[in-house]
């Protein structure tokens, strides 16, 4: 094979991530031609409703997966936080690249920190996870849905529709917009979405040649962390419909996983954490999920 076709969404961030993967593949496989196949997805097109209302983040994948099934693309690049906990057959993730910045960012043109926002300030985010943590920190805030790509969201802030918005640090950094980060929202006080900051490459599991071409990009330490986070989310039956957060980091030879379930309506947060082996990420994820259930997560999730 001399050409590899990467299906990608058309947003600037998706194109950056896909070109990042393409560049890495060219370096590992001299002589391989890598081309992008930009596509529009329903998740990109429907911006007047929340993702939960129109079917969840899996909408960002379906068109790209169909392109692979039709033979129009060999693989697809995704933000791993947008990838469902269970992939449909025959798809697999042969490569999870080294993780970028997992933190969230408060972006404001007027106020330096979350606590500096005035009483009743208007904050834009459609993420239930972010809404839950905002409600816990500042119950007075007016939280307003905000959809669209990074540049669209920044434009809405700059046009005066919001006092602040919350975005992912990694997205801003990848687009050369790190200067727009007003304040970092960091673990352990503020937890990101499972796998936030990680880029994954998806392909058909029955295509060994493509799988092997992509697998050279896999970052084992990142994979261990995000697999633990996603295992916790899976054990909670979580998706983008529920406010679930998780963050794993290496401590010596072990992983330390923090998890959270929250309520976007009243800011109640439940936390749990545990250490575990990087060779047993599924067990670690279930252990933290069990800790959340013991503290009442099932009741909180049932209220959603």
UniProtKB/Swiss-Prot annotation:
EC number assigned by the record: 2.5.1.61
PROSITE patterns, per database record: PORPHOBILINOGEN_DEAM (PS00533)
InterPro entries in alphabetical order: HemC, Porphobilin_deaminase_cofac_BS, Porphobilin_deaminase_N, Porphobilinogen_deaminase_C, Porphobilinogen_deaminase_C_sf
Listed CDD domains: PBP2_EcHMBS_like
Cofactor note: Binds 1 dipyrromethane group covalently.
Enzyme superclass (EC): transferase
Pathway: Porphyrin-containing compound metabolism; protoporphyrin-IX biosynthesis; coproporphyrinogen-III from 5-aminolevulinate: step 2/4
GO annotation, cellular component aspect: cytoplasm
Keywords: Porphyrin biosynthesis, Transferase
Further remarks about this protein from its record: The porphobilinogen subunits are added to the dipyrromethane group.
Function recorded in the entry: Tetrapolymerization of the monopyrrole PBG into the hydroxymethylbilane pre-uroporphyrinogen in several discrete steps.
Family the UniProt entry places it in: Belongs to the HMBS family.
Protein name, per record: Porphobilinogen deaminase
Source organism per UniProt: Xanthomonas campestris pv. campestris (strain ATCC 33913 / DSM 3586 / NCPPB 528 / LMG 568 / P 25)
